[in-house]
Amino acid sequence: MVTIERLLPYSYWIGHPVTNRAIIYPFVGFIPLSLKEVKTLQFIVKLNTAKWELKYQRKRLGHMRPG
């Protein structure tokens, strides 16, 4: 059985928040999660959401520059 702790090293790979949901929902649906595991999931989602938001803002600024 895969645990949340085993997923943590791969959190960089989980990436985009949509992918976060695709991976996390099966865990939430089928495995009783401890408080530690829920907090770990929240941390991974927060980390990756912030990372993608920053990339999106940079991309938007690049499109707004006069060409």
UniProtKB/Swiss-Prot annotation:
Task performed by this protein: Facilitates virus release from intestinal cells in vitro, possibly through the host autophagic pathway.
Membrane topology of the entry: Single-pass membrane protein
Species this chain originates from: Coxsackievirus B3 (strain Nancy)
Principal place of residence: host cell
TM helices/strands, residue ranges: 22-38
A single cellular component GO annotation: membrane
Residue ranges of the region described as Important for viral replication in intestinal cells: 13-18
Protein name: ORF2p protein
Subcellular location: Host cytoplasmic vesicle membrane
Alphabetical UniProt keywords: Host cytoplasmic vesicle, Host membrane, Membrane, Transmembrane, Transmembrane helix
Signal peptide region: none
